[in-house]
Every structure is written in C-alpha cells, then in structure tokens.
Regions:
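Transmembrane helical segments that form the transport core of multi-pass membrane transport proteins
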Residues: 223-272
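A short amphipathic helical element positioned immediately N-terminal to and/or at the very start
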Residues: 32-40, 108, 213-225
Length: 348
C-alpha cells in the first residue's frame, strides 16, 4: 500500500510539474510561429544531437560493464546498456532522480549480481557523475569571470546554489566513504534531532538500516583504494559522457543556421544549467531548466530562443526519456522476467 501511494504521488507530481512547465513556457507565445521555426530546422544537424543523447546513455553502460569486469563479473555490453537505460528512465520521472539507482539495483539483482556489488558500483557512478559537474562548475566560476558577467548575471544565485549543493553532496559522500565512523556519528546525531523534534517517528529498525548502509560505504572505500586506475578511467569516461550531452544544444543552434557564438560557449552555457538544477527536487530539472535556458541563451538564439529551447530540451531530456523508456521495456521483457539460474551471469 505504501509503495502504491509513492508511485501515485510520483506520477501526480510529474504530471503537475509538466503541466505547470508547459503553461509557464508557452502561455502568451505565438505557437504557430514557433512550430514553423521548428519545422524549418535542418534535421541533418538534429540527428547527431539525438545520437549524442544515445551516446550519453551508452557511456554509463560502459562504466557499468568496466566496473563489473573489475569484480570478475562478465556481462554483455547490451545488458549493461539496459541497466543504464533503466537508471536514466526512472531518474527522469522521479524527484531528485531518486528512483534511478534503486531500480538499477533491482534489475542487477535479477542477473544474480549481489546488492553489495551493485551498491558500490552505483555509488561510484554517482560520485564521479557529480564530481564532473563540480569540476565544470568551479572551472566556470574561477576562470570564466567574463563569461559569468556576460551570460549569467540574471541567474548567478541559482548557479551558485546548484554548485554549492553539488559540492556539499560530493564532500558528504566522500566523508561517508572514507570516514564511515565519523559519518555514522553524524547520521545518528541527525536522526536523534529529527526524532526529538518529531519530524521523524522513532523506529527500532532505523538504526539497523543505517548500520547496513555503512557497509556499502566501507566496501566503496576498499574498492577505491584497490582500483585507483579504474577510478581515473571512470572519471575520464564520465567527463566525455557529460560533455556529449552538453554539446546537444550546439547542434540545435546549428540546425537553425545560426552563427556568432562558439561551440565551447554554447556547451558551457548548457553545463551551467545542469550544474544549477542537478540537485533540485524536480524530475529532470523540469520547469527550472526551461526557465534558465530562456534567460541565459537569449543573446545566443535571439528571436529563435523559444524554438531553440524546445528542441534542446526535446532532445536532451525528452529524447533521453523516450530512448531510455524503450530500452526499459526491453529490460523488463528480458531481465525483469528472469529467475535464478536462467538469468545467471558469468564470473571469473
């Protein structure tokens, strides 16, 4: 019953945010002119943009495949692509992308991959994913002062908030991994405060769950210490993966035969949006992403700003949602129906 309520809440929340986004973005706009502009866009430039979205999903699957092999688990790359698709699909439709990794762990379990192994792999993917955003965000903040003042004056508070939240998240997860005793003390103290002020009801099993979660962080620390080269390679793959997704907007820009703004400027403007919205409790950053795009890309797209936003978000978010949804269905029909030895993977 509790699970059903959560599913219903997430569904209603997603529909509500989507409806408000559509209303906020398109209310009072000339939709006919916008559609004419979209139809006139050069599809030869949009096709590579869509390919980059697929590459983005594929990039995580390569990381999963690579880390599984470091554990001696031999998986087919197409299986890892299904794991990746499941993660991106449920991340797209749940607040703060909270549903992606639990569902990945569920499907990995269907392939007889233990929860401790999948938890470590998914933890490292999360840390490196956010670490790349932090590096890009700090790089823009420190070395792009002119860039900040030219394009980001109107959204600097949101950018710094997003960057700060990502830095906090990476720092906190690093403490959890490398200082589990300190992390345990902090979390126990936090739980006691929440229970004292009746924000959370006291539950006997909550501390036991906390202890179990600490095992994941200890295992992650052990992996990081014994596989430094693997971690460096994962960070490099993640960086390329993220840059590919940021570059989608440049292909939209070229599809309208626009010029005057360089590739790296467009890429880093899109990166700023990702840094700003990544930690916000909205499915896919819906609503705030569109607002930020319409603010910072005004000097780039000019009169084609709204159709540019529609195509950029259409490829970068809704394209990702569609591709990952299709392969999530495949995952359910192949992996999700498997049982026990029928789904057994090869171990070295």
């Amino acid at each position: 019953m509790k699970k059903n309520k959560k599913v219903i809440f997430n569904g209603v929340f997603l529909v509500a945010v989507f409806a408000l986004t559509i209303y906020g973005v398109f209310h009072g706009e000339d939709l006919e002119s916008m559609m004419d502009a979209i139809r006139s866009a050069d599809k030869r430039w949009l096709a590579p943009g869509l390919a980059l979205v697929a590459f983005f999903i594929w990039g995580e699957s390569i990381i999963i495949w690579y880390m599984m092999r470091s554990y001696g688990i031999k998986l087919k790359k197409r299986t890892c692509f299904l794991f990746s698709s499941v993660g991106f699909f449920f991340s797209c439709i749940t607040p703060s992308a909270s549903g992606g990794q639990p569902m990945q762990a569920y499907y990995m379990k269907k392939k007889n991959i233990s929860i401790p192994v999948s938890a470590v792999i998914l933890m490292i993917i999360t840390i490196t994913y956010k670490l790349v955003l932090v590096v890009v965000g700090i790089g823009v903040a420190v070395f792009g002062r002119g860039f900040l003042h030219q394009y980001l004056e109107g959204i600097l508070p949101v950018f710094y908030l997003g960057l700060g939240l990502n830095i906090f998240c990476v720092t906190f997860m690093t403490i959890l991994v490398f200082h589990p005793l300190l992390a345990r003390s902090f979390l126990v103290w936090g739980l006691s405060i929440l229970e004292k002020f009746r924000i959370l009801r006291h539950k006997e099993g909550r501390l036991k769950k906390l202890e179990d979660s600490m095992d994941t962080y200890r295992d992650t620390a052990a992996y990081l210490k014994t596989h430094p080269r693997v971690i460096v390679n994962i960070i490099a793959i993640t960086f390329v993966q993220r840059m590919a997704m940021f570059a989608v907007t440049w292909f939209v820009y070229k599809a309208f035969s626009l010029s005057g703004t360089g590739f790296w400027t467009v890429l880093f403007l899109q990166a700023v949006i990702s840094v700003s919205v990544d930690m916000l409790p909205l499915p896919g950053g819906m609503g705030i992403s569109e607002t930020l795009f319409l603010t910072i890309f005004t000097p780039v797209f000019g009169t084609l700003l709204l159709p540019g936003m529609v195509l950029s978000r259409g490829l970068g978010y809704y394209g990702e949602l569609l591709i990952s949804a299709l392969f999530t269905i495949v995952a359910q029909l192949t992996i999700g129906q498997g049982h026990g030895k029928d789904n057994k993977e090869s171990y070295e």
